[in-house]
């Protein structure tokens, strides 16, 4: 979803 990049910390 839109938070995918953030979750890939």
Swiss-Prot record:
Record localization? Secreted
- Its main localization is secreted
Leucine amide is found on: 9
- Keyword terms, alphabetized: Amidation, Neuropeptide, Secreted
Say if the entry is tagged with keyword Metal-binding. Answer: no
Query: Record's Gene Ontology CC terms?
Result: extracellular region
Report whether Translocase shows up as a keyword of the record: no
What's a single GO BP term from this record?
Answer: neuropeptide signaling pathway
Its family remark reads: Belongs to the FARP (FMRF amide related peptide) family.
Biological role: FMRFamides and FMRFamide-like peptides are neuropeptides.
Name of this chain's protein: Extended FMRFamide-3
């Amino acid at each position: 979803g839109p938070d995918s990049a953030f979750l890939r910390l």
